[in-house]
Swiss-Prot record:
Transmembrane segments: 23-43, 60-80, 120-140, 155-175
Similarity-based family: Belongs to the formate dehydrogenase gamma subunit family.
GO molecular-function terms, A-Z: electron transfer activity; formate dehydrogenase (NAD+) activity; formate dehydrogenase (quinone) activity; metal ion binding
Gene: fdxI
Protein's name in the database: Formate dehydrogenase, cytochrome b556 subunit
The organism's taxonomic lineage, starting at the top: Bacteria, Pseudomonadati, Pseudomonadota, Gammaproteobacteria, Pasteurellales
Length: 238
């Protein structure tokens, strides 16, 4: 039983500022790395290198934006890995995936902070990112490629290309799902979601990790206490 009445329109923190900054840095680096990578792999798209000035500049920048992308991702991975460990409760989501696609996720699954689909994507992107980093270093002509034999370089190129495709596909799915689930974009842009959204899409996260902290924040607010809240979103800079 809740200690205090909580409106479904109450705003709660979904992603804090450091995570959102890292996420959008990752987005920028992803597109810069993707555009240059596609241009190198497919000659018909060589014009994409002109976005950064010249093909030479694009080739020089590509590995560095890739490394920045990797570290931005790793920060997020370390921040959220414990929320992405598969658990027995995820089986309900898998069995009810058709209902999930119909928009009835709340009727078949009791999700924590992330559902099974998000967890699968998380670990897929981890695999792709690590493979891209390792193979990219092997292929980096200016510094490292001369240390490796031609067969190793060929395998690295093949794995790099496959991992890039895996990453690109995963990001497309991520973008589509973010727009498909209304309210998700706001969570990563502004950092907050409503209690209604949390109850519908991630009810166990709301019950186990948010509710008690939210009650405390609201009680403090009612009693006139000021300061940093735990989960209650009070606006930027507050």
């Amino acid at each position: 039983m809740s200690k205090i009445e909580i409106s479904n329109d109450t705003r709660i923190i979904r992603h804090r500022t450091p995570a959102r900054i890292s996420h959008w840095m990752l987005v920028i680096c992803f597109f810069m790395t993707m555009f240059t990578g596609v241009a190198f792999f497919f000659p018909d798209f060589a014009w994409l290198t002109e976005i950064l000035g010249t093909p030479q500049i694009a080739r020089a920048i590509h590995p560095f934006t890739g490394i920045l992308m990797f570290f931005a991702f790793i920060y997020l991975a370390l921040l959220y890995w414990d929320h992405n460990i598969p658990e027995k409760n995820d089986i309900r989501w898998a069995k009810g995936v058709i209902e999930v696609l119909k928009g009835n996720e709340h009727a078949v699954a009791d999700n924590g902070k992330y559902n099974l689909g998000q967890k699968m994507l998380f670990w897929t992107l981890n695999l792709a990112m690590v493979t891209l980093l390792v193979t990219g270093i092997i292929m980096w002509r200016q510094y490292f490629s001369h240390y490796f034999s031609i067969p190793v370089l060929r395998i690295a190129i093949l794995l790099h290309s496959a991992s890039a495709f895996m990453l690109f596909t995963g990001i497309l799915v991520h973008i589509y799902m973010a727009f498909w689930v209304k309210g998700s974009i706001r969570g990563i842009v502004e950092g907050w979601v409503t209690v209604r959204w949390a109850k519908k899409h991630h009810p166990r996260w709301y019950r186990e990790e948010v509710l008690s902290k939210l009650e405390e924040d609201l009680l403090n607010e009612q009693s006139g206490k000021v300061g940093k809240t735990k989960v209650l979103f009070k606006g930027f800079g507050k």
